[in-house]
Amino acid sequence: MNCLTVPGVHPGSPGRPRGQIQVIFGPMFSGKSTELMRRVRRFQLAQYRCLLVKYAKDTRYCTTGVSTHDRNTMEARPACALQDVYQEALGSAVIGIDEGQFFPDIVEFCEKMANTGKTVIVAALDGTFQRKAFGSILNLVPLAESVVKLNAVCMECYREASYTKRLGAEREVEVIGGADKYHSVCRACYFQKRPQQLGSENKENVPMGVKQLDMPASRKIFAS
């Protein structure tokens, strides 16, 4: 599958409007936001009314727009829940959503908008740093017309990277950060501890079935 192929459906056409959901998955640093912005700009050039939504708590690079890790930006509407932009979305033909995994109503919103004839493009992490499903985002897969998963470059060995590895000891699922907190990694490097992770506080990257020799006396548990 060509990961850059966009289905040729024209939202808001004079005949019957045909909605669709496009999903762009991948680990951190795989170019998800870059691809989302490329697709939205493509529709803007064709004079479609577009709405780009960003997660309001992600203020790493820009507070008023979507930003890639290399600081390319695009104006966006910040929100913590997609219902907050419902009316604006109804007035748009194309809706782009960045960091879709953080929105609790992502599945319901996308399905509702697609059923009203909108093209909805979602960029999201498919998995957490523990390689578990991120919220309800994977429930979009059976509803979507187009699903792609981009790979990054492993930041530890430079091979293809499909996973996101947390560098710190935080246990919460939602910890927003860049290269200071996360690496994109391949399968082998996901299980390889970095020097600062050799202590006993971070065991998320240990493969199942491997016995732990360093057992802490106590450990704070976070709900995830």
Swiss-Prot record:
Gene Ontology MF terms: ATP binding; identical protein binding; thymidine kinase activity; zinc ion binding
Reactions accelerated catalytically: thymidine + ATP = dTMP + ADP + H(+)
Phosphoserine modifications at: 13
Subcellular location: Cytoplasm
Assigned keywords, A-Z: ATP-binding, Cytoplasm, DNA synthesis, Kinase, Metal-binding, Nucleotide-binding, Phosphoprotein, Transferase, Ubl conjugation, Zinc
One GO term (biological process): protein homotetramerization
Top-level taxon in the UniProt lineage: Eukaryota
Keyword Ribosomal protein: no
Post-translational modification: Phosphorylated on Ser-13 in mitosis. Phosphorylation of Ser-13 by CDK1 during mitosis reduces homotetramerization and catalytic efficiency when DNA replication is complete and intracellular TK1 is still present at a high level. Polyubiquitinated. Postmitosis, ubiquitination leads to proteasomal degradation. The KEN box sequence located at the C-terminal region targets for degradation by the anaphase promoting complex (APC/C) activated and rate-limited by FZR1.
E.C. number(s) listed in UniProt: 2.7.1.21
Residue numbers covered by motif KEN box: 203-205
Main subcellular location of this protein, as a coarse class: cytoplasm
One GO CC term on file: cytoplasm
Cysteine pairs bridged by disulfides in the record: none
Pfam families: TK
Residues that bind Zn(2+): 154, 157, 186, 189
Broad EC category: transferase
Family: Belongs to the thymidine kinase family.
Remaining remarks: Two forms have been identified in animal cells, one in cytosol and one in mitochondria. Activity of the cytosolic enzyme is high in proliferating cells and peaks during the S-phase of the cell cycle; it is very low in resting cells.
Subunit structure, as described in the record: Homotetramer. Tetramerization from dimerization is induced by ATP and increases catalytic efficiency due to a high affinity for thymidine. Tetramerization is inhibited by phosphorylation at Ser-13. Interacts (via the KEN box) with FZR1.
Function: Cell-cycle-regulated enzyme of importance in nucleotide metabolism. Catalyzes the first enzymatic step in the salvage pathway converting thymidine into thymidine monophosphate. Transcriptional regulation limits expression to the S phase of the cell cycle and transient expression coincides with the oscillation in the intracellular dTTP concentration.
Comment field on protein domains: KEN box sequence located in the C-terminal region is required for its mitotic degradation by the APC/C-FZR1 ubiquitin ligase and interaction capability with FZR1.
Protein name: Thymidine kinase, cytosolic
Species, as recorded: Gallus gallus
Taxonomic lineage of the native organism: Eukaryota, Metazoa, Chordata, Craniata, Vertebrata
